[in-house]
Each structure stands twice: as C-alpha cells, then as structure tokens.
Amino acid sequence: MWQLLLPTALLLLVSAGMRAEDLPKAVVFLEPQWYRVLEKDSVTLKCQGAYSPEDNSTRWFHNESLISSQTSSYFIAAARVNNSGEYRCQTSLSTLSDPVQLEVHIGWLLLQAPRWVFKEEESIHLRCHSWKNTLLHKVTYLQNGKGRKYFHQNSDFYIPKATLKDSGSYFCRGLIGSKNVSSETVNITITQDLAVSSISSFFPPGYQVSFCLVMVLLFAVDTGLYFSVKKSVPSSTRDWEDHKFKWSKDPQDK
C-alpha cells in the first residue's frame, strides 16, 4: 500500500503519525453514467478523493498502468476499443479506488444501462444508443425476443419498479435511414429480497396460501379466547368476594 501513495502524501502521513489504512478510498465516476459505449463516443472519468494543500494532483491507472494525466478528470474525446478496461484513481490523501470497467464496442446500436443486476422495485433505465448519435427512429425494446416498448422516435425506456418477470435477455432495434439495425443482446437480472426469498423457499407456492389461512384461523381463535377469558374474569371475582364475605361471618369470629 505504501508504494501507491504519492511522495508528498507519504511525508505528511509520517509527520502526522497516520497509517495508509486510515485514509479514505478514492472513487471513480463515469460521465455519462454508461460503462458500455460505442467507438467515437466521448467519456469523462472523474476522481473523487481528498487532497493535501501541498499536492492536488491525481494519479490515474488504466489496466494497472499509470496514465500521464494528473487532473481530477480524465477525458476521452473519441473512444477506441483499446480504451476498454479497468480504471482506477488516487489522490494525495486517499488510497487507490476500486476499479471501474469501461467497454468500448463497435456497431451501429448499443443497449446501455447503468448496470445489469437490479433488486425488486428498483427502477431500470435503458438507452438504445446509436453510433455517433445518428438519427434513429421506429425503435423497439425487446425482452426475450418479444417487443416490450415501441417509440416512433428514439427514446429511453424506463421500468419504474422492477419485478422478477423483468429478468431476461434484452436488445433494441430501429431504423437508421432505411437500414434496419439491432444491438447486441444483454442479460438483465432481478434479484429477490432475501427475507421474501427465504419464506418462499421454505413454503412451496401451494402451501403459502394454506399457511396464510392457518395464521388467520389461529388469530381468530386466539382473539375469541381472549374475549372469553376477559368476560369470565368479573364473574370469578364476584364469586371470590361472596365467598370471602361468608367466611368472615363464621360464628367463631364473632
């Protein structure tokens, strides 16, 4: 870890008695948010991290090789396939960031999303991106080979709340001029909440309904017993008081 620190930061750490493990980790952001892009697209990678007053430089790594750029933003004006790979950054008062993957593809269309794994009820944002933003019309988003959404003019496709049924293979197609073009297929996975999943796996579908009915029945019986006991309590109390009164009138107590 020490060899990854900038020289000035290393001196500051030694003088302050700090350890490299005490430093926060830098974070890399993509702008725009898509990590899959087409050739000729512009991409900006931004590094978020702490800087010392003496050193505001940033170190960038592409596939573990140091990049000459030392600014907080690394700009790729026209992406090429060899720009694909892992990017990391580090500032003078931060440790090396986790890697961010960039994929540069060749083709007319590319289906884009911030990621491909979502939780139930999360929103999904899909974009049918054309090479050099060429005009695209009559766009269809397809799931498992079936049309899911159609737009006369190219538009992004939103799924407000994902369900398990939204899992599957997706691609988009449309017209560039009179040319029919399609994107590659990608897989989207919707994961289930662990608590719901554990209940569903414990009780097979046919037994889940029976389980609910049993729970309702037990609740009804329990409620009936509660009111029955509550109703009998005053009567028992009166009997006890009558018994106590008769006992106090015993001739031996006079």
Swiss-Prot record:
GO CC terms: external side of plasma membrane; extracellular space; plasma membrane
Key word Repeat present: yes
BP GO annotations: antibody-dependent cellular cytotoxicity; calcium-mediated signaling; cell surface receptor signaling pathway; Fc-gamma receptor signaling pathway; natural killer cell activation; natural killer cell degranulation; natural killer cell mediated cytotoxicity; phosphatidylinositol 3-kinase/protein kinase B signal transduction
Membrane spanning stretches: 207-229
Lineage top rank: taxon: Eukaryota
Positions bearing the site annotation: Cleavage: 195-196
SMART domains per record: IG
Cellular compartment(s): Cell membrane; Secreted
Extracellular topological domain residue ranges: 21-206
Coiled-coil blocks: none
Keywords: Cell membrane, Disulfide bond, Glycoprotein, IgG-binding protein, Immunity, Immunoglobulin domain, Membrane, Receptor, Repeat, Secreted, Signal, Transmembrane, Transmembrane helix
Signal peptide (from-to): 1-20
Domain Ig-like C2-type: 24-105, 107-189
Oligomeric and partner information: Forms a heterooligomeric complex with ITAM-containing signaling subunits, either a homodimer of CD247, a homodimer of FCER1G or a heterodimer of CD247 and FCER1G, to form a functional receptor complex. Interacts (via transmembrane domain) with signaling subunits; this interaction is a prerequisite for receptor complex expression on the cell surface and intracellular signal transduction. Binds the Fc region of antigen-complexed IgG with a preference for IgG1 and IgG3 isotypes. Interacts with CD2; this interaction is involved in NK cell activation and cytotoxicity.
Protein name, per record: Low affinity immunoglobulin gamma Fc region receptor III-A
Native source species: Macaca mulatta
Gene: FCGR3A
